[in-house]
Amino acid sequence: MNTRPFYFGLIFIAIIAILANYLGNTDFSHHYHISALIIAILLGMAIGNTIYPQFSTQVEKGVLFAKGALLRTGIVLYGFRLTFGDIADVGLNAVVTDAIMLISTFFFTALLGIRYLKMDKQLVYLTGAGCSICGAAAVMAAEPVTKAESHKVSVAIAVVVIFGTLAIFTYPLFYTWSQHLINAHQFGIYVGSSVHEVAQVYAIGENIDPIVANTAVISKMIRVMMLAPFLLMLSWLLTRSNGVSENTSHKITIPWFAVLFIGVAIFNSFDLLPKELVKLFVEIDSFLLISSMAALGLTTQASAIKKAGLKPFVLGILTYLWLVVGGFLVNYGISKLI
């Protein structure tokens, strides 16, 4: 068995990931809140649509491994970023709000995209995952469950990145208007429950107030912890929608990496490992996710994205409006009830 395409592919991916990580830590990237994940997929797409086809057979096995196994490992290790103690810091209000926003946003996106915009179901589910939970990371986590092609994943990531970035500029303006309705703590929950990416949530909070920032990040991480049950629900929905009756012996596909993700988060909650080791796991996790994004970019053809048309972005802006307006109404209502 020729293993050279496997190892050469991993080395090639590692080089792109290292470059993306370096660029993601520059002052320019920090100022404009451009993460290494986004840089990795852009670099991957740039190479994938120019010189990569000339030597793809020499590295393809390693690239596909990075896109699959490294992604799943990265999602599992993501659990080291979370503890269940975080929930106590923001209270039941945030948990209920996050759950309502996750469910309502996903089904809003699915209904709008499939029934009214007549879009590809896989693309809609990926976009819904990204808008409902944690942006690009959720899209990547949903990819093995939906079994979507690379270009669909890239389109979904583009949608959540564009409108999540827009949120960085609009939410601080909205805070000024809403101060007479909700306090800083409640606005932090609103940000954490409705903005796409963790980095975007942090950026918004830092631009407003320390209380908003701390509450928003914790609220967002609670939303991230809902990734595993969401993937199980998505797997069940896909099985049912594919025409599997309750009387058949067909088994629902369980995304075990999602279950392990929760297991790691539970383990991390007991604070058994030295903080330096946990920090190392988080750094390894970041590199694995950056690597898988680079592999995703390499296997994405620009022509396939162009073929998707404007509908994904129409879906993105309508979902964004739901997150901003509907999200505020949900947060305001919950704050009065709990």
Curated annotation (Swiss-Prot):
Cellular location(s): Cell membrane
Keyword annotations from UniProtKB, A to Z: Cell membrane, Membrane, Transmembrane, Transmembrane helix
Major location category of this protein: membrane
Pfam families found in the cross-reference section: Cons_hypoth698
Recorded topology in the membrane: Multi-pass membrane protein
InterPro entries (UniProt xref): UPF0324_pro (IPR018383), UPF0324_YeiH-like (IPR004630)
Keyword Transmembrane helix: yes
Transmembrane segments: 5-23, 33-55, 62-84, 94-116, 123-145, 155-177, 222-239, 254-273, 280-302, 312-334
Cellular component aspect of the GO annotation: plasma membrane
Cysteine disulfide links: none
Domain of life: Bacteria
Assigned protein family: Belongs to the UPF0324 family.
Name the record gives this protein: UPF0324 membrane protein NMB1979
Taxonomy of the source species: Bacteria, Pseudomonadati, Pseudomonadota, Betaproteobacteria, Neisseriales
